[in-house]
Amino acid sequence: MMHVRYILQTCLFLVISTMAVAQPVSGELIGADSVQKVMIIPFNQYNYFSDADNELAEKNEMSATDISTMFRYGLNYNISTRVIATDGAYNILTDTTVSSAKDLELIYASVTYQFEKPVDVTVPDTLTDRTIKQPDLFGMGEQEPVKEEKKKLIDVKKEDEEPKNEKYLNAHVTHPEIFPVLQQKYHTDIFLFINSFELVTNYNHCLDRSKNYFERKVVVHYSIYDANGKQLKGDAMTVTFSSQQTNVDEIIATQFPVIAEYLAGTVTHVAQTDAPDTSTKK
C-alpha cells in the first residue's frame, strides 16, 4: 500500500507541475480588492460515517448508497447557497466538466487526514500543539484523564452550554502548490474542505422511551485554507435532532441549513482576518 501511495503522490506532483507550467501562478489573493471567491470541496465518500443508514434506507425506500449521495449533494448545495449570499462560490461537485472532475480527484489525492485540536487563525494559541493521540471517528474512544479541579468545573456546567470540540478531522494538503494552481484556474481565494460527515445516534440519550426515539447528530469536520496554503480554520460543526426524523429530504431541509449558515459565516470571518491590508499608509 505504501508503494502504491508513493506512485500516486509522484504522479500527482507531475500533474500539478504540468498545470503550473500551463498558466501563471502567483498565490496573490485575487479577492484582495473584491469579493473573495470560495471553492467548496465536498467530503470524499470514504469519509462518510453513519450508524443510521439501514434505518433511513428502509424508511425512505432507497439504498444506503443513495442515502449518502443525497446527504453529500444536499450539504454541498446548502453550503454553496449560503456562501454565495456573502462571498462568491465555486461548487466543484456540481461542475459537470471533465476537467473539474479530474481536479477534484487530484485534490483528494493530495490530502491526508489527521485528528487534531481545533485551529483558528484569529486565535493564535490554537496554531500550536494541535495533535490528538486518539483518532476516533465516533467520539467514543478514550480521552486523557481530567484533572480533579477541572472536573468540578465540568460537573457544574450549565445545561444549555454547548461543549467545545476537543478534536476534529483535519485535512493536510501534501502538495500545497496545488492551491495557487486552482486559484488561477477557478479564480478562488479561499478553499473550504468538508473533511468528513458523521451521522451518529446516541443510544444513551433516549428522548421518548415509549416510542424509542434517541438523540441523533450530524457532525461535519472542515478545514479552511487560503490560496497560499495557509490554514485559517479547522473544527467540527454539530447539529442535534431526534431519531424520530427519518425522512432524508426533511433532514437535509431542516438540519443542513444550520450547518451551512455557520460555515458561511466562519468563511467570511476568517477570510476578512486573513485579507491583506490595502489601505494607504500616510
Question: Predicted regions span which residues?
Answer:
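Detector for methionine-enriched segments
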Residues: 1-2, 19, 39, 62, ...
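Short secondary-structure boundary/capping segments
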Residues: 2, 54-58, 209
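Bacterial Sec-dependent N-terminal signal peptides
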Residues: 1-30
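An exposure/low-complexity boundary signal
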Residues: 17, 108-113, 280-282
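N-terminal segment of the mature soluble domain
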Residues: 54-193
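C-terminal/domain-edge helix-coil "capping" segments
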Residues: 23-51, 68, 155-206, 210-282
